[in-house]
Every structure is written in structure tokens, then in C-alpha cells.
Amino acid sequence: GILSTVRATREASFENLYDKSKKLLDYMLLHGVTTVEAKSGYGLDWETEKRQLDVVGALDRDHDIDLVSTFMAAHAVPPEYKGRSQEYLELIVEEMLPRVKAENLAEFCDIFCEKGVFTADESRYLLSKAKEMGFKLRIHADEMESIGGVDVAAELGATSAEHLMMATDEGIRKMAEAKVIGNLLPATTFSLMEDTYAPARKMLEAGMAITLTTDSNPGSCPTANLQFVMQLGCFMCALTPVEVLNAVTINAAYSVNRQDKIGSFDTGKQADITILDAKNIDYPLYFFATNLTHQVYKAGKLVVDQGRIV
């Protein structure tokens, strides 16, 4: 679980985290990914949270993939604050968030709003303070139960809400009205062997924009294969091929606040292009469990060619 990974991350050096993360990014690049949102959240103390964010910054400079950083110290309540979740959030607000902002370590702030983790009121408290400091907002909500996280997302104008397997019709309506993007993580549902996938069709019918993302993490979703996630979007979320492609291109660009730079072929945008070995738009979602990437271009430069990083 999360706390097991927290223990391992606290013991890991910068170099160890960098090397492991670089391997994941290489794998993603080989599968056609050119921009990644990376979250902290496996430290739950300042030293380790900063180390994770420093790794993200270093890899953003060093790797062909562009990284967008999210600060998520509110991923869980650390063992040393067990039973004192509000006190831990106050520590984040008073000590961690100002330092993250001062050192420009992250663009977004996220929290896990779920029964047994943080309540809707606690999530509102943290995200309101983060918004005042100039952070863009995300929230993990409605993964196992609907406890008001999507209401917080709508009230505060969050860029996105993640998971949403248990989203209600009313919650979907509120998110659609507030233009909250639904970041759907079907590989997590698959990995946990759950039956309920996010109601993607209801979201689209309500006017929500959605993305499909890997949720790559060592606990609940140990995959970095976006093509597999796209296939789950078709098979388990009833999305069409065009809807899937929108979810991993222009909608994803909006979710990381890069819509003016990436996500579509437009004059003035960066030429991030993935060419698949596929005869039509349907084929990558029909021929599953295979990497179909032929070439990847980052800002117009060839970075992957026939299964190898250039």
C-alpha cells in the first residue's frame, strides 16, 4: 500500500529515485508518450517530498519527455500523524506549500479525498490554501466512495479530479458545469480486480472533458503502458477510438495546462508526434497488449525509431 512505498521512498537516495524514474520514462517514451504529469506523495515529510520533486525537476531537464510536477504530500496521513490528520494538513499549509512555491518545485497541488484518508472538509481546507498561494488544483475523488470530493473540485475550480469510479450523476453535473476534467485511471481498476470503472459515457454526455492516464505507481497500478490504458478505455469504459485519442492528446494537454503548446497539430504548437504501426485509427485499440509505436518526435526531433531510443 501507500505507506509501504512511503517507507521505501524515505530510505531511497536521490540517485536511486532518479534512476528508477528514468527507466519508467524511457519505457513511456518507447510507447509513444511525450509529456508526463509526475506527483510526489510517497514521502509525507518535507525532506522526502522535496527529494521527489527535485527528481522530477532534474528529469524534466534531462529527459526527452516533458514533466509537469504535482505536489501531493496529502496522499495519506503519515504514521507519525496517525489520528491527527488536520494537524498534518496544517503542517503542509504552513511549512511545505510555501517552500514548494518559493522554490518553484510544483505547478499543481493534489489531495486524496477518500474515506479513511482525508475528508471533503479537509480537502477543501488544503486546496483553498493552495489556491491562495497560486497553485493549480487536482483532487483524487470518488475512487471507493463518493464523500464530497467532486463537490470540492467544482467549488474551487480544480483543473481535474482523478479516479471517479463512484462518481454520481449529480457529481458529474457539477464537474461539467465547473469545467473540471475527469482524469480516468482504468488500469487501476483493472489492477485492483474491481468491477466498477469510471462512468465515462455519462461524463461525456454531461459535457465533461475526460482523459485516460496510467496512474503508474508501485502499489495499485504498476504499469506505464498508456497504449494498454487506451485499450481499457475502449473495452471497459465504452469509449470510441476517436474519444480515446482525444483523451490522450488535446484533453490531456488541457489537464496539464499545456494546451497552447501540445495536444494537437496547430500552427505555433510544439511538434510532439507519435507514429503508430497501424493501418487505421481503430487498429491500436483492437490489437491489444502490443507496443505499436513506430516513431516518436519530440519538438520535431526524432527520439524513438523502430523500438529504440535515438
UniProtKB/Swiss-Prot annotation:
Its cofactor is Zn(2+); Fe(3+). 4-imidazolone-5-propanoate binds at residues 42, 75, 143, 220. Its EC number is 3.5.2.7. The keyword Iron-sulfur does not apply. N-formimidoyl-L-glutamate binds at residues 42, 217, 219. Pathway: Amino-acid degradation; L-histidine degradation into L-glutamate; N-formimidoyl-L-glutamate from L-histidine: step 3/3. One of its GO terms (cellular component) is cytoplasm. Keywords: Cytoplasm, Histidine metabolism, Hydrolase, Iron, Metal-binding, Zinc. Transmembrane segments: none annotated. InterPro entries: Amidohydro-rel (IPR006680), HutI (IPR005920), Metal-dep_hydrolase_composite (IPR011059), Metal_Hydrolase (IPR032466). Its main location: cytoplasm. It is found in: Cytoplasm. Fe(3+) binds at residues 140, 215. It catalyses: 4-imidazolone-5-propanoate + H2O = N-formimidoyl-L-glutamate. It is an enzyme of class 3 (hydrolase). Binds 1 zinc or iron ion per subunit. GO terms for molecular function: imidazolonepropionase activity; metal ion binding. Signal peptide: none annotated. The keyword Hydrolase applies. GO terms for biological process: L-histidine catabolic process to glutamate and formamide; L-histidine catabolic process to glutamate and formate. Zn(2+) binds at residues 140, 215. It comes from the Bacteria. Belongs to the metallo-dependent hydrolases superfamily. HutI family. Catalyzes the hydrolytic cleavage of the carbon-nitrogen bond in imidazolone-5-propanoate to yield N-formimidoyl-L-glutamate. It is the third step in the universal histidine degradation pathway. This is Imidazolonepropionase.
